[in-house]
Regions:
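Short glycine-rich anion-binding loops that position phosphate/pyrophosphate groups of nucleotides
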Residues: 49-52, 139-142, 184-185
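Structural motif
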Residues: 43-45, 132-133
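C-terminal functional extensions of proteins
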Residues: 185-313
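Positively charged, low-complexity intrinsically disordered leader regions
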Residues: 1-43, 51
Length: 313
C-alpha cells in the first residue's frame, strides 16, 4: 500500500473519528514529501509549540515537539538546513528538545509581537540560503474571529505569538511552500477544510477551527504522528542512500530521548482538561510513551519492508 498505509497508521482513530479530515487530505503527505526532496538548496523551517496557561507549571504541551524533532533530525541527517521556530512561552521546551538532535539546527524564538514575527520573516526570506519550506506541527491558528483558541474555546491570544504571519498575511506574498500538520482542526493548515467538516466533525468547530491554510495538509490522530508520517513518506520516495540517512534516527529510542528532554528539562505537559491542569509527564495526548512507541515501530517496520521490496524489484 505504500504511503497510503502510512496515512492509515497515523490516522487511526484514538478518541475522535478524524476519518473525513483524513480522507480530505489523502495524497498530500506524499506530495509534501516530494516537494521537499525535489527542491534544490532546500531549507526547511519547522514551527511548533502549543502553550497551556493553566498547566502546572504553565508550559507547552508535549505534542508537536517529538514530531518536530524527528523531522528536524531526518532532514539534517540528509544535509538539509533546518530552522526550528517557536515563541517565548514555548521556548524552554522547544530548546530542550533541540539539544537532543544528532545534528545542529538553527533555533529562532520570537516575542509575542507581530513586529517580531515579521522581522523573522524578513530574515528567513533573505540570506545565502533562504527558506524554501515551512512546516507547522501542532501550532494553533487564529480562527475566523482572529483569535487562537484551545479545543474547548479558550482564547490563547495572550500566550501565543502570531507565527501564522509566516504562513499568511494580507498584502504579503509568501516565498516558501507551506505544510500544516494537526489533529484537532484548530492548527495552522486546517483552514483548507470544507465548511461541512468544520461544522460537523470538529468539536466547537464554528468557534475554534483554523482560518490559516497551507499548501499541503497532513492530518493525523496525534500531531507527532503526522511528523513521523512525513519522515516515513520522504524515506519512501527518496533514493536508497538518502532513505537510509533520513531513517538513521527514526527509532523509538530517539523518540524517548526527545520526550524526556521536553518533560524533564522543558517541563512540557500533558493531560490538560477544563477541570484538571496539565502537568509534566511522559505521555502525549493522554497516551503513554509506550503506546506511541508501538505506532512508531509499526511505521518503521512498514517503511523498511517497502524499501526492501523496492530494492528486490
Amino acid at each position: 500500500m505504500g504511503i497510503a498505509k502510512v496515512e492509515d497508521i497515523i490516522g487511526e482513530t484514538v478518541r475522535r473519528d478524524i476519518g473525513r479530515m483524513k480522507r480530505f487530505a489523502e495524497g498530500q503527505l506524499e506530495a509534501a514529501a516530494r516537494s521537499i526532496l525535489s527542491t534544490p538548496n532546500a531549507h526547511v523551517g519547522i514551527v511548533t509549540g502549543f502553550f497551556i496557561r493553566n498547566a502546572v507549571p504553565p508550559s507547552p504541551e508535549t505534542d508537536g515537539l517529538g514530531g518536530m524533532a524527528h523531522m528536524a533530525a531526518a532532514l539534517a541527517n540528509l544535509g538539509i538546513p533546518v530552522t526550528v521556530i517557536s515563541d517565548a512561552p514555548c521556548s524552554k521546551a522547544v530548546w530542550a528538545v533541540t539539544t537532543e538532535l544528532p545534528n545542529g539546527v538553527a533555533l529562532e524564538i520570537t516575542s509575542l509581537s507581530a513586529a517580531s514575527v515579521r522581522s523573522l520573516r524578513d530574515r528567513l526570506s533573505t540570506g545565502e540560503r533562504p527558506l524554501t519550506h515551512l512546516v507547522a506541527i501542532e501550532r494553533v491558528s487564529p480562527a475566523r474571529d482572529g483569535k487562537p483558541h484551545r479545543e474547548y474555546g479558550a482564547d490563547m491570544s495572550d500566550d501565543t505569538a502570531p507565527l501564522h504571519l509566516l504562513f499568511d498575511d494580507p498584502d504579503w506574498r509568501r516565498p516558501w511552500v507551506t505544510i500544516g500538520i494537526g489533529d484537532g482542526g484548530n492548527e495552522i493548515g486546517m483552514g483548507v477544510l470544507p465548511e461541512e467538516i468544520v461544522r460537523e466533525d470538529i468539536p466547537n468547530g464554528q468557534l475554534i477551527s483554523a482560518a490559516v491554510s497551507a499548501d499541503y495538509l497532513i492530518v493525523s490522530s496525534v500531531s507527532n504522528w503526522g511528523g513521523w508520517g512525513l519522515v516515513s513518506a520522504m524515506a519512501m520516495v527518496a533514493p536508497k542512500e538518502a532513505a537510509a540517512r533520513l531513517l538513521a534516527d527514526f527509532t523509538p529510542d530517539r523518540d524517548r530521548a526527545y520526550l524526556t528532554a521536553a518533560v524533564d528539562v522543558g517541563q512540557a505537559v500533558d493531560d490538560s482538561r477544563i477541570d484538571r491542569p496539565a502537568t509534566p509527564k511522559m505521555s502525549v495526548d493522554r497516551l503513554s510513551w509506550e503506546q506511541h512507541a508501538q505506532v512508531l515501530g509499526r511505521l518503521r517496520a512498514h517503511v523498511d519492508g517497502y524499501l526492501a521490496d523496492r530494492q528486490r524489484s
